[in-house]
Amino acid sequence: MSESLRIIFAGTPDFAARHLDALLSSGHNIVGVFTQPDRPAGRGKKLMPSPVKVLAEDKGLPVFQPVSLRPQENQQLVADLQADVMVVVAYGLILPKAVLEMPRLGCINVHGSLLPRWRGAAPIQRSLWAGDAETGVTIMQMDVGLDTGDMLYKLSCPITAEDTSGTLYDKLAELGPQGLITTLKQLADGTAKPEVQDETLVTYAEKLSKEEARIDWSLSAAQLERCIRAFNPWPMSWLEIEGQPVKVWKASVIDTTTKAAPGTILEANKQGIQVATGDGILNLLSMQPAGKKAMSVQDLLNSRREWFVPGNRLA
């Protein structure tokens, strides 16, 4: 067995909680957990703890929830724990240089892409959006840049034609803890081999927005189908019909050309709603009108056939 490390864990969402859960059964000593402050959630806007806080408190771990790690007194919280290493997974706060240098072995981060591709906020979604054949996780040594640190360990997985950001998130939430435990063993043994990122291969995973998720019919059918999967479960691809937003859950590409203007409805039947795009035809299969549940196109046509008259154009 490798040396048992004193670990500070910093993370916030479910993705991070799955990594903390793996650490708890790894033989290492979790000396403190940092997570974002409780936030208002739900219709009642009740203050809700993060998934990481819920797990940490359930296991009796000390929890810290600073709004920022810039104030000296908050940095002292980290210093007082005398950690060997700080593990950061989707924490959501910037770690100042002073904090990065406090643990004996520094701070390591689990990132949801094969760096240097897709540095930034939305690596899982952007890998789908771009049509990448594979993605994975990178465990890296943190520095002051945005996902610029040396890479310690990588695990990859294929992206299938059915994957959404939701399914890919689950795959990487399985891979990440495996890579993390292996990396910690290497750090404890002194066998880790840091690899500098190739700056010529860098791409940036820009944040998603609801406006970007609005369907732009001038794009190709292939790109739109990828967007629909990349933006599922958030922010969800959508279009506007009679002034109300309609989310699109699933679509397919029909490999045929058309001379119809982008956005023109070509067919509407139980096989789907076929719409002309900038290149090819997009076949809408599952949609969700405002205030309703997601439904098959057949069910939607039964109640809203007037929305999808062939020859009409969608906005």
UniProtKB/Swiss-Prot annotation:
(6S)-5,6,7,8-tetrahydrofolate binds at residues 113-116. The keyword Cell cycle does not apply. InterPro entries: Fmt, Formyl_trans_C, Formyl_trans_C_sf, Formyl_transf_N, Formyl_transf_N_sf, Formyl_transferase-like_C_sf, GART_AS, Met-tRNA-FMT_C. GO terms for cellular component: cytosol. Keywords: Protein biosynthesis, Transferase. It catalyses: L-methionyl-tRNA(fMet) + (6R)-10-formyltetrahydrofolate = N-formyl-L-methionyl-tRNA(fMet) + (6S)-5,6,7,8-tetrahydrofolate + H(+). Its EC number is 2.1.2.9. It comes from the Bacteria. Belongs to the Fmt family. PANTHER family: METHIONYL-TRNA FORMYLTRANSFERASE (PTHR11138), METHIONYL-TRNA FORMYLTRANSFERASE, MITOCHONDRIAL (PTHR11138:SF5). Attaches a formyl group to the free amino group of methionyl-tRNA(fMet). The formyl group appears to play a dual role in the initiator identity of N-formylmethionyl-tRNA by promoting its recognition by IF2 and preventing the misappropriation of this tRNA by the elongation apparatus. This is Methionyl-tRNA formyltransferase. The lineage of its organism: Bacteria, Pseudomonadati, Pseudomonadota, Gammaproteobacteria, Enterobacterales. The gene is fmt.
